[in-house]
A protein has these predicted regions:
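Bacterial Sec-exported substrate-binding components of ABC uptake systems
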Residues: 1-79, 183-208, 270-278, 300, ...
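Short helix-initiation/N-cap motifs at beta->coil->alpha
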Residues: 62, 118-126, 245-252
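Extracytoplasmic substrate-binding proteins
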Residues: 64, 146-215, 311-327
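A short, structured surface patch at a secondary-structure boundary
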Residues: 73, 79-128
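Extracytoplasmic ligand-binding site segments that recognize negatively charged/polar headgroups
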Residues: 100-105, 144-146, 161-173, 207-229, ...
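Proline-aspartate-enriched helix->loop->beta-strand connector
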Residues: 131-139, 156, 261-264
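Alpha-helical, coiled-coil/dimerization segments enriched in small aliphatic residues
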Residues: 220-249
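Structured C-terminal subdomain patch of bacterial secreted/periplasmic proteins
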Residues: 260-327
Length: 327
């Protein structure tokens, strides 16, 4: 059964997570030939300049960008970049909104008052970006690959390969472009210390199952995901079917019992009635799992556990893990 599910994951995840975005790059999308190396390849990017020193040339996913001075007017093109700059104490002058109706993550809302939108991640308003006179644009090859020539003509532009599981490498790249590499390293050191503290608070080694309900999809998340990286950093094991170097395994309501684990954490990307969560969670197969019978299945916030994509979101996930699993 495990081998079968893993094979299914490789094919099911072949649909581009660039979605219907014609400006994206499918090679680095889920199932693309460059997906699984995005973290190691991103780690090779950045600048050789001394910390905080400008001018500097930053190597990134689409080439090299020279920054003559420390940026002060930054525009971010996705929620990952938004979390990154805010985690460094920098408020962007403009931001692209997610395609989802939910908009920007609510956990960042108090820091975004007055920050204008520049379109959505897949439908940028280049005129609005130009009008804000940025001196740095942060985005990704996955989302805006084909717009890079136009964006880089507006302002120096630095692209990561893709959001998601390379979130720590992306954060260091953003810190490099902003001349905040020392602070970025400290933020990640503090994050790992927090993860170690969470691990110390948990008795034993419970296997953690991750279930996400989406419109037309039901996913069990693997290691190459934002939340998968966090669980690995904490040192918590995964059920065999999810302990894979893939974004996720796709199952069906009829095979939901493959989600069994010592603890099950689940969320819905959208309204539970629309994603199938309400029906599945009320059904007999869900109720038949031991974790559910014994009260060890817990609903969590989708926007932090699956959409956070940066250090601030990751810190909130750690808080959740400690609250739900700690002594």
């Amino acid at each position: 059964m495990v081998a079968l599910a893993t094979v299914f994951a490789a094919t099911a995840c072949g649909t581009s997570d660039a979605g219907s975005n014609a400006n994206g790059n499918t090679d680095v999308a889920t199932g693309g030939q460059l997906f699984s190396t995005a973290d190691s390849e991103t780690a090779k990017l950045g600048s050789d300049a001394a910390p905080g020193e400008f001018p500097r040339t930053v190597k990134h996913a689409l080439g090299e960008t020279t920054l003559d001075t420390k940026p002060s007017r930054v525009i971010v093109l996705d929620s990952g970049e938004l979390d990154e700059v805010l985690s460094l104490g920098i408020t962007p002058v403009g931001m692209a909104s997610p395609e989802s109706a939910a908009g920007q993550p609510s956990y960042l809302a108090d820091k975004l008052v007055g920050v204008p939108d520049v379109g959505t991640t897949n439908n940028l308003n280049l005129e609005a970006i130009t009008a804000l006179k940025p001196d740095l644009i942060l985005g990704s090859k996955l989302r805006q690959d084909k717009l890079y020539p136009q964006l880089s003509a507006i302002a120096p532009t630095v692209f990561s390969i893709r959001p998601g599981f390379p979130w720590k490498e992306n954060f260091l790249l953003a810190g490099d472009a902003l001349g905040e590499e020392t602070k970025a390293e400290q933020v990640l050191n503090d994050y790992q210390a927090h993860a170690d503290q969470v691990r110390e608070s948990i008795d034993g080694s419970p296997t953690i199952s991750l279930v996400r309900f989406m419109s037309g999809k039901l996913r069990l998340y693997g290691n190459l995901s934002f939340i998968g990286v966090i669980l690995k950093d904490v040192g918590l094991p995964r059920p065999a079917v999810q302990d894979i170097d893939e974004l996720a395994v796709e199952v069906s309501p009829e095979t939901i019992t493959e989600a069994e684990g010592d603890r099950i954490f689940y969320s819905s990307y959208g309204k539970p009635a629309d994603t199938g969560q309400a029906t599945v969670v009320a059904g007999p197969l869900w109720a038949s799992m031991n974790a559910v019978k014994e009260g060890r299945a817990t609903e969590v916030s989708d926007e932090t556990w699956f959409l956070g994509l940066g250090p601030t979101g990751a810190g909130l996930v750690l808080d959740d893990l400690q609250a739900k699993l700690g002594k």
